[in-house]
Amino acid sequence: MLWTDCLTRLRQELSDNVFAMWIRPLVAEEVEGILRLYAPNPYWTRYIQENHLELISILAEQLSEGRVRQVEILVDSRPGSILSSSEQPATTTAALQTAPIPQPAKVKREPEPVANTAVSSKSSKKKLLNPQFTFSLFVEGRSNQMAAETCRKVLTQLGASQHNPLFLYGPTGLGKTHLMQAVGNALLQAKPNARVMYMTSESFVQDFVSSLQKGKVEEFKKNCRSLDLLLVDDIHLLAGKEASLVEFFYTFNALLDESKQIILTSDRYPKELTELDPRLVSRFSWGLSVGVEPPDIETRIEILLKKAENSGVDLPRNCALFIAQQVVANVRELEGALNKVVAISRFKGAPIDLDVVRESLKDVLAIRARTISVENIQRVVSEYFRIPLKELIGPKRTRIYARPRQLAMGLARELTGDSFPEIGMAFGGRDHSTVMHACEKVVSLREEDPIFDEDYKNLLRLLQS
């Protein structure tokens, strides 16, 4: 039979998931040179038309030796057809059950409860965003200021084309989720009846597949496309989820057509998402893309102090400085370190001081001692600027050596627990005031000179990788 031969070839051409979920359940019949394929619902037919009909047509013509010159895909409403019943066909259900279905995302335990979705107060399914994710509780610094300001601006011009979609990108644990949910919380506070939905890309896939299994695709589409604000976390994780990507594409377009706001997050800039459909990636760039960088040491200190204050914890500033010097990767690790310090303090029944902090972070200190040292920083900086190590450490004050030297001292202060005198000794026996001046100079140069700031960020990434 022609369709059986087509199935054999399609199994070779397509992924196992796509074949099992979308192709195997189709019913086929050949009528006067036309191969008719029947699908359970309109969504199914649209997916086949836009993704696989051309391939099926080519195979049908080849395998029939020209007998079949046209392939049609229709919703099966034939009398007595199993596909015309209110239930999904047994073969469809079986196929979906054998295909790997994403499991519900495991929610990390945070000090405050976190929910997956926020919808309007009219909804019968009333779930809330994390109430702690607000603008007032977000600590701003040079690394995230533009992203925070943009998110606040979105609230005043919801759906405006210049920032729709708003695409926040950067490494994990830097506050992208906090910012996007802050927009949702602020909107719901101002307009309690606004329809807001927050989901991860995994939960989008899960809900979509579930709607297919239960025959509730139209309900899923209606829920997603009637929003005022859609927030989707980790959009890059939709890669490889072909059917879900198609549905997200249509949802995305429908919301943009209605000038409804979309905010997405990813670990990379849109054009670096090469594993996603280029059409979708192109649309991600229609609005505004804003990067979020790892926080500098001043911001890390303020994050720790605010977190401690909100938790009713007395954290001395010198202890916050010490923690911030040791934990540099992201906000999540920073908060984890603080939680450990608080736990040790309570266990010992002692106030938080440097001894308690050092004991709490001994594992972190041991790892950092093996990986980031002043000597390591000097080597990386000298290689980056292609200058001899002896000149970086030496006495010459010419600009070609002085700027990299100041930068290296600033990095040493930020990334190691060494004191100013210790850093000075590592740089040819310079005194502590020279190191202090270098660190202050680095702060001012980063604000004044974009090239210097970019060099600093590049070196920070190299040393932290």
Swiss-Prot record:
It is found in: Cytoplasm. InterPro entries: AAA+_ATPase, Chromosome_initiator_DnaA, Chromosome_initiator_DnaA-like, Chromosome_initiator_DnaA_CS, DnaA_C, DnaA_dom, DnaA_N_dom, DnaA_N_sf. SMART domains: AAA, Bac_DnaA_C. Residues 1-87 are annotated as: Domain I, interacts with DnaA modulators. Residues 128-345 are annotated as: Domain III, AAA+ region. One of its GO terms (molecular function) is ATP binding. One of its GO terms (biological process) is DNA replication initiation. One of its GO terms (cellular component) is plasma membrane. Keywords: ATP-binding, Cytoplasm, DNA replication, DNA-binding, Lipid-binding, Nucleotide-binding. Belongs to the DnaA family. HAMAP family: DnaA_bact. Oligomerizes as a right-handed, spiral filament on DNA at oriC. Domain I is involved in oligomerization and binding regulators, domain II is flexibile and of varying length in different bacteria, domain III forms the AAA+ region, while domain IV binds dsDNA. PANTHER family: CHROMOSOMAL REPLICATION INITIATOR PROTEIN DNAA. This is Chromosomal replication initiator protein DnaA. It comes from Acinetobacter baumannii (strain ATCC 17978 / DSM 105126 / CIP 53.77 / LMG 1025 / NCDC KC755 / 5377).
